[in-house]
Amino acid sequence: TFAMFAAGRAYEQIRNSVAYPHFNVKICATHAGVSVGEDGGSHQCIEDLALMRVIPGMTVLCPADANEAKAATMAIADFDGPVYMRLARLATPVFEGDMVKPFVLGKANVLREGKDVAIFATGLMVNESLMAAEALAKDGIDAAVINVHTIKPIDAECVTAWAEKCGKVITVEEHSVIGGLGDAVADVLMGKVNCKFHKIGVNDQFGQSGKAADVLREYGLTADQIAATIKANI
C-alpha cells in the first residue's frame, strides 16, 4: 500500500505489534515521496524513512531500481526480523552492465568513483545523482556516487571511507532532510570525519499536487538542480 498508510497510519501497530516483539514481518510500502505526483501532500509520504529508522531493531531499505527491488525482496525473505522497504510510484531507469552490483543488506554500492565530492543517494535519487555527476564532470568536478539502498543499518565503513577520501559529502533523497538518509550519514560522520556536508531533500514542508516531474523540480530533486546545489555547496 501507499507509504503514507503503511508507515503513517499503521505506525503504532508496526511499533508495538511488529518491532517490539521483534516479529519476522516485512513491510513493503510503495508510492513514497513527492513523485507520487497528483495525489498531493496528503499522500506524498516524506517522513517514512525517519519514522521507521527510529524504531529499535527495524531494518530500513530503499532500492534504486526494479532489479535491486527484486534482489532486496529475496534478501529480506531470508532475513529474520522486521524490515521496512520503501518503493516509489514513478518508473525508474533500470541499471545495466557495470552498474548492476550484488545486493547485500547493510552494504552500500559504489556506482561511480570520484575524488572531489562523495554523493550518497538512495531510491529514485540514485539515477538523478548519477546524471548530476555526469554534469559536474563537464565542469571539472569529479564526483563519486554511492547507492545507499540500506538506510538502517547504514554502511558506516563505506560512508567514512568516502568522506575521508573526498572531504566533501552530499546526501540526496526524495524524503525530508529531517531524519532520513542525510541524518543517518551525519550520525556516522559526526565527531569522526572533518568534512563539508550538505543534505539535499525536501526541506521542512509538505508535498503538493502536480505532475511528478514538476513536483520533483519544485523541490530541487532533478539532476541539473542537484548538480547546481552541489556546486554551490562544495
What spans do the regions from the language model cover?
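Thiamine diphosphate
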Residues: 36-37, 88-234
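Conserved thiamine diphosphate
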Residues: 1-113, 117-118
